[in-house]
Amino acid sequence: MAKATFFYFLFIGYVWPIDSVMFNLAPNTQKCLKEDIQANQLVMGEYEVSDVPGQIIDYVARDTKGHILSQKEHITKGKFSFMSEVYDAYEICFISKVPPHQRGIPQEVSLVTKKGVETKSYEGIGEASKLKPLEVDLKRLEDLSDSIVRDFILMRKREEEMRDTNEKTNSRVLFFSIFSMCCLLGLATWQVLYLRRYFKAKKLIE
């Protein structure tokens, strides 16, 4: 029983990831982190920046069309959230700004992000519904399973779209190849007939 419980909690820890990253941002540069996110998903993040006097770091979250979803200047430590309207590649950028007269140094940036079911507070849900810890974990796994199923459905849909696109492309390439061959055959036939008439006119052939 203890062994089964161990593997159960190991499974929970494995399938319940939280994206966390830490990096150094050079002076007067920017670094963007990009990820594909499904439609209608809540994205939450928490950031912290090492303090360097005279240096400023801003952050902005946006989609591929440039629509700003969240933005803040002069950040040090805080949280943000936004809702994805459509399936897209969303990016979070950190921008360093250092005055020209100052010699800047790299700043350390840490970022933790959650999305979808990861943003739910299952502890609060358990307290409100008076659920046992094991029941809360089962609820978490149920929601995560639904999320995985939706991901697979989306992947399958994208695969079908890509396959349809490939089939259409192959059909167009085949049509273009046949059309090109017909044009070449027509041109070759025209050249033969033209040369035949030319040589007959010059009485080089009968």
From Swiss-Prot:
SMART domains: EMP24_GP25L. GO terms for molecular function: cargo receptor activity. Belongs to the EMP24/GP25L family. It is found in: Membrane. Residues 194-206 are cytoplasmic. Its main location: membrane. Keywords: Developmental protein, Membrane, Signal, Transmembrane, Transmembrane helix. The lineage of its organism: Eukaryota, Metazoa, Ecdysozoa, Arthropoda, Hexapoda. PROSITE patterns: GOLD (PS50866). Residues 30-140 form the GOLD domain. The keyword Membrane applies. InterPro entries: Emp24-like, GOLD_dom. Residues 18-172 are lumenal. It is a single-pass type I membrane protein. GO terms for biological process: dorsal/ventral pattern formation; endoplasmic reticulum to Golgi vesicle-mediated transport. Pfam families: EMP24_GP25L. One of its GO terms (cellular component) is cytoplasm. The chain crosses the membrane at residues 173-193. This is Transmembrane emp24 domain-containing protein bai.
